[in-house]
Amino acid sequence: MKTIAVLLLVVAFALGLTACDGGGSAPGYTGPNGVIFVPAGGGVNVPIFF
């Protein structure tokens, strides 16, 4: 029973190390990734995309 547990831990560790492997380059999409609401003149909230 202990050998099965150790085997599962080794497999989980190996998969954890390789989970983030990818193409190695950043994606080409550079569009807006969020919105910040800032008060403009007159107290109206205007979305500012960054």
From Swiss-Prot:
This is Gene 38 protein. It comes from Mycobacterium phage D29 (Mycobacteriophage D29).
